[in-house]
Amino acid sequence: MRKKNDEDFILAYFEENEILGMVGFIRETGQKFRHKGHVWGVFVYPDHRRKGIANQLMLKLIDKARKIEGLQKIKLSANRTSIASVELYGKLGFKPYGTERNAAQYDGEILDEVYMDLQL
């Protein structure tokens, strides 16, 4: 079990008291790895995609992460077939550093994962 860390957070995007999207952030806890954090759970409901919600959430996440003392890098991964996600992360300054082949399976399809990071 992971020890609670006050620097971990979840951001949500609301419209008229309805949650339309969310993103999570978790900071590494080990002494050698505390300079890194991870983005997880980026999600926007399908009916609300392509409206800039993920962009707004990610901008807020990056801003919040920059204020965490000692944090130097944010990492994330995205399914290679999720072109919009990979492009969004690239526009936000994330750089790809590797691909994991056969990282996941969904509906019988084998999927590759692109790993990206942003130096703060």
Question: Model-found features: residue ranges?
Answer:
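Conserved G/P- and acidic residue-centered "switch" motifs that form tight phosphate/ATP-binding loops
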Residues: G52
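Terminal substrate-recognition subdomain of acyl/acetyltransferases
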Residues: E109-L120
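Conserved GNAT acetyl-CoA-binding A-motif
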Residues: M58, A65-A78
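Acetyl-CoA-dependent GNAT
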Residues: M1-D47, M58-K60, K64, Q119
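Conserved catalytic-core motifs of GNAT/GCN5-like acyltransferases
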Residues: K75-A78, G90-L111
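Conserved N-terminal glycine/acidic-rich loop preference
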Residues: Y13, F33-W40, L57, A84-P96, ...
